[in-house]
């Protein structure tokens, strides 16, 4: 079952694609794609509005990161779907503080598999996002909190040696 965040990501991807093909505003395109289910859920609408407004506000910055990583490619040569999936994931990585970057990247890969422009779209999206994320992390530009922390360990803490039990033979 898709989460509401996956549904919203897919709707925003469709809106971004429509904007490039039809030359309408992102707000117009996104408004056409909202479902009753999303409109009725306050958490879904909060995420939708955050992602949409962040993409609009930071598109030039996001495109610069993509252009720096794809320096051998002109942005116009990158498939529209792939470019917009990367835009959306980078926006989440940079501006959605509670979403772990690996979740954003994984969601982008899964969406690329579904909406693939080529059979290698998911690998292309993964490679570009991974490279940009590593660069941003090295430069200290990724700021996460709560559930979005980058290096949060999920392993069990080790018992202190004083509490360890010895096995007698």
Curated annotation (Swiss-Prot):
Pfam families, per database record: NusB
Family matches, as SUPFAM superfamilies: NusB-like
UniProt KW Transcription regulation keyword: yes
MF (Gene Ontology): RNA binding
Domain of life from the UniProt record: Bacteria
Region Disordered, residue ranges: 147-169
Listed GO CC annotations: cytosol
Keywords: RNA-binding, Transcription, Transcription antitermination, Transcription regulation
The keyword RNA-binding is assigned to this record: yes
One example of a Gene Ontology biological process annotation: transcription antitermination
Cross-referenced PANTHER family: ANTITERMINATION NUSB DOMAIN-CONTAINING PROTEIN, N UTILIZATION SUBSTANCE PROTEIN B-RELATED
HAMAP family linked to this entry: NusB
Family the UniProt entry places it in: Belongs to the NusB family.
Function of the protein: Involved in transcription antitermination. Required for transcription of ribosomal RNA (rRNA) genes. Binds specifically to the boxA antiterminator sequence of the ribosomal RNA (rrn) operons.
Name under which the protein is recorded: Transcription antitermination protein NusB
Annotated organism of origin: Chlorobium chlorochromatii (strain CaD3)
Primary gene name: nusB
